Amino acid sequence: MNTKKQSRIRRARRARLHIRDLGANRLTVHRTPRHMYAQVISPCGSKVLASASTLEEALRGSATGNKVAAKEVGTLIATRAKAAGVTSVAFDRSGFKYHGRVQVLADAAREAGLEF
């Protein structure tokens, strides 16, 4: 019997295979009930080019598990990725539905200039 987490991990693994075939940098997102995390990872998968999360001092003071926090993380990851020389990425939702906080983070990253 599959648990909810095992099903999500299986979906994520399947999507990552397609992203790896593209050979693009990937913007990966992880969410927990309390926090949001985002990383831009190199095509080979061995190097993190930029990262942002609600655990950082700048974002920790406000609410960390809602859409407002997700929007701030999306904006921050886009500015850090552009500073690292990354302009386009493949969006890796890590098996989460493209809805709610994941969607808000992606939209904020697009508005801040990241292409995907």
UniProtKB/Swiss-Prot annotation:
One of its GO terms (molecular function) is structural constituent of ribosome. It holds the Pfam family Ribosomal_L18p. The keyword NADP does not apply. GO terms for biological process: translation. Keywords: Ribonucleoprotein, Ribosomal protein, RNA-binding, rRNA-binding. The keyword DNA-binding does not apply. One of its GO terms (cellular component) is cytosolic large ribosomal subunit. This is one of the proteins that bind and probably mediate the attachment of the 5S RNA into the large ribosomal subunit, where it forms part of the central protuberance. Belongs to the universal ribosomal protein uL18 family. NCBIfam families: L18_bact. Part of the 50S ribosomal subunit; part of the 5S rRNA/L5/L18/L25 subcomplex. Contacts the 5S and 23S rRNAs. This is Large ribosomal subunit protein uL18. It comes from Marinomonas sp. (strain MWYL1). The gene is rplR.
